[in-house]
């Protein structure tokens, strides 16, 4: 009898929560588990804020934190996660191409402005020839850093697209030395470089605030329109009701308010 009840509860959990108000009370009290990989900041913090709202819908959110940009995609593709939340679509698309994974963006949740932070040099007006600027070493985020340098008038590029590399620099009047560093290490590189262009989440982990950056991406820039962070899932899972419920809550007014107030400009809700 217990086995029959358990199976029945499982079936009800799959069809009875989410967009129509959650699981019913009574004997079927077991929550559906939803396992989501995330960067510690801000993604895991945002998910923790969403967890109680999901619980009301009969969904237990299990958050798995990752310190890098590779393992959460590997784990999702292998079926160890139901979704992940740490990356933008260009990075995910490039990862799919490079690794042969089959991941897709289910929804755009928020945008993290890239910031250029002072290291050994305190402001752009004090910039000297041969200054060292550290940038992310992955393809899409390095392009984003180069576009920010271009927007500050520090370099000129032969094209202004999201696949630019250092080879596309046609003018570098200050002779900037651009060093590629793994994104998680950028904040730590500040004592050794003049400036570092840092991903929003790693800037926050390094206790850096967007308001203190010497330059940031504009909210109406190409980057802002392109690099919103997504809920990524395996291809074919887009219609799972528990994932739809997660997206609905992350895009709710309550979560948007949390992002704005908690992160002070470091996290901008996606439109």
PLM features per residue range, with description:
Residues 1-33:
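Short, low-complexity disordered leader/linker segments with a strong preference
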Residues 30-41, 59-65, 132-133:
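Short, well-ordered beta-strand elements
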Residues 63-74, 161-188:
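Short helix-initiation/N-cap motifs at beta->coil->alpha
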Residues 65-69, 79, 83-93, 109-110, ...:
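Beta->alpha turn/N-cap motifs
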Residues 94-106, 121, 192, 197, ...:
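Ligand-binding "clamshell"
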Residues 106-155:
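A conserved helix-loop-strand patch within extracytoplasmic ligand-binding domains
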Residues 113-124, 227-240:
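A bilobed periplasmic-binding-protein/Venus flytrap-type ligand-binding module shared by bacterial periplasmic
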Residues 143-150, 250-270:
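Periplasmic-binding protein-like
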């Amino acid at each position: 009898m217990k086995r029959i009840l358990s199976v029945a509860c499982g079936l009800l959990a799959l069809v009875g929560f989410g967009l129509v108000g959650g699981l019913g009370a009574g004997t079927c009290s077991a929550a559906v588990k939803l396992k989501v990989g995330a960067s510690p900041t801000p993604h895991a913090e945002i998910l923790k804020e969403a967890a109680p709202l999901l619980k009301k819908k009969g969904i237990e959110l299990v958050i798995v934190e990752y310190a890098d940009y590779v393992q959460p995609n590997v784990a999702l593709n292998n079926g160890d996660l139901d979704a992940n939340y740490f990356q933008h679509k260009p990075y995910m698309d490039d990862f799919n191409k490079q690794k042969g994974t089959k991941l897709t963006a289910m929804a755009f949740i928020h945008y993290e402005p890239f910031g250029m932070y002072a290291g050994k040099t305190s402001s752009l007006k004090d910039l000297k020839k041969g200054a060292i600027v550290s940038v992310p070493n992955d393809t899409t985020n390095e392009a984003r850093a180069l576009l920010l340098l271009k927007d500050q008038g520090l370099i000129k590029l032969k094209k202004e697209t999201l696949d630019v590399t250092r080879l596309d620099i046609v003018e570098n009047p200050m002779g900037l030395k651009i060093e590629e560093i793994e994104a998680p290490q950028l904040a730590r590189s500040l004592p050794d470089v003049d400036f570092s262009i840092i991903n929003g989440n790693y800037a926050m982990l390094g206790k850096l605030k967007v308001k203190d950056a010497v330059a940031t991406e504009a909210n109406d820039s190409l980057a802002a329109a392109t690099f919103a962070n997504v809920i990524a899932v395996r291809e074919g899972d887009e219609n799972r009701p528990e994932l739809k419920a997660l997206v609905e809550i992350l895009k709710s007014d309550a979560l948007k308010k949390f992002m704005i107030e908690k992160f002070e400009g470091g996290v901008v809700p996606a439109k």
